[in-house]
Amino acid sequence: MLSSRRISLAAATLLIGCLALSQHARTAMAQAGEAFPACDALAAIESADFGASIAIDNPWFPLIPGTQQVLQGFANRGGGELPHTVTFTVTDRTSIVDGVETVVVLDEDVNEGVLSEIELAFFAQDGEKNVWSFGEYPEEFDAETGGFIAPNVWFAGEGEGEPAQAGVLVPGDPSRGTRWHLQGWSADIDFLDCGQVFKMGQTLGNPNCANGVCKDVMVEKERSPLARQGGIQYKYYAPGVGLVQIGAVGDQENETLKLVARADIRGTAEWDRVLAEVDRLYDNACDRGFDLLCP
């Protein structure tokens, strides 16, 4: 582990290699054929750096409770490229993860009209407006049992061996060409994601942006060095809106999505449904032994 004093994203990128990662992760990266380092580690967090952690107003990734975004496109989940929809809803629920209060987001994946995965995701913002990912509780449909299972859960600060680490999903002051940085890591589930700002100042057409045009778009590349056949995802973030498009190169799933709807759903039946789903997932997680989500 690095020092418990958290440093800024800019300073963190000066670290050599993934020093905070275990030998297990380094070995896995080498076996995957990736040149070390895969991404620069970030120092361990300090809760004091997250004084207003749930007021997430990062220009490129604002998380305002009640906001629901729907992205539609195609993805290959083993049966060819099929219609795929992701619904991303910022709730008013919060949870303490690794000593930091986080915003809870409900993420629902639907393939050909059938729910394939439903997830609680946990985000927080530091004093420099970097938005951190602190963990995920996903339930995935299991064709063998006809039910949902949860094999890929991770929370920062938790783990049977080395504790998982939070990472920066969207930087607060992005600049093109910065080094690959850690987005999240868990040895328990062989999870490691890295991100890099690829382009700035891009323009995209989308009806959910002012006058149908998204300006000053940031493009971030994401990859998983542990995936033997993993490619690169490109995520497009528009100021004041958030994620507006996803593309992929060399990725098996070849997920391509565009934002088709964005609304404040508070006070609606859909809002009630979302909160009921969140409560249900909390109960499931607690029943499965993830005490962090127990009352």
Which positions does each model-derived feature cover?
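Bacterial N-terminal signal peptides that target proteins for export
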Residues: 1-11
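Bacterial N-terminal signal peptides
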Residues: 10-23
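Signal peptide processing junction and immediate N-terminal pro/mature segment
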Residues: 21-31
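Conserved functional acidic sites
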Residues: 31-295
